[in-house]
C-alpha cells in the first residue's frame, strides 16, 4: 500500500510557516504539585528525627 506524499515523517515547512502564533491563547500555568522549599524539607527532617 502506497501512502500519499502528504503522509511523510518530515514536517511540512509550508504548514509550519503559515502557523499563526497569535491564534494561541495565553494560559497561566499553575504547578499542580509544587516541590517543597528547603525550609519545609528541613522542618520535616527534624520532625521525623525527634
Curated annotation (Swiss-Prot):
Domain of life: Eukaryota
UniProt-annotated stretches for the region Disordered: 1-50
Chain positions found as N6-acetyllysine: 10, 18, 32, 38, 45
Entry GO CC: cytoskeleton; cytosol; nucleus
Biased amino acid composition, Basic and acidic residues: 9-31, 39-50
Residue numbers carrying Phosphothreonine: 29, 40
Record keywords, A-Z: Acetylation, Actin-binding, Cytoplasm, Cytoskeleton, Isopeptide bond, Phosphoprotein, Ubl conjugation
Tissue note: Originally found in thymus but it is widely distributed in many tissues.
Major subcellular location class: cytoplasm
GO biological process: actin filament organization; positive regulation of DNA-templated transcription; positive regulation of smooth muscle cell differentiation; positive regulation of smooth muscle cell migration; regulation of cell migration
Pfam families xref list: Thymosin
Sequence position, cross-link Glycyl lysine isopeptide (Lys-Gly) (interchain with G-Cter in SUMO2): 18
GO molecular function (one): actin monomer binding
Compartments it resides in: Cytoplasm, Cytoskeleton
Modified residues (Phosphoserine): 8, 37
Annotated family: Belongs to the thymosin beta family.
Subunit relationships: Identified in a complex composed of ACTA1, COBL, GSN AND TMSB4X. Interacts with SERPINB1.
Protein name: Thymosin beta-4
Gene designation per UniProt: Tmsb4x
Amino acid at each position: 500500500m502506497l501512502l500519499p506524499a502528504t503522509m511523510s515523517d518530515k514536517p511540512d515547512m509550508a504548514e509550519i510557516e503559515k502557523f499563526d502564533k497569535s491564534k494561541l491563547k495565553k494560559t497561566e500555568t499553575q504547578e499542580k504539585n509544587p516541590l517543597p522549599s528547603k525550609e519545609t524539607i528541613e522542618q520535616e527532617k527534624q520532625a521525623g528525627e525527634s
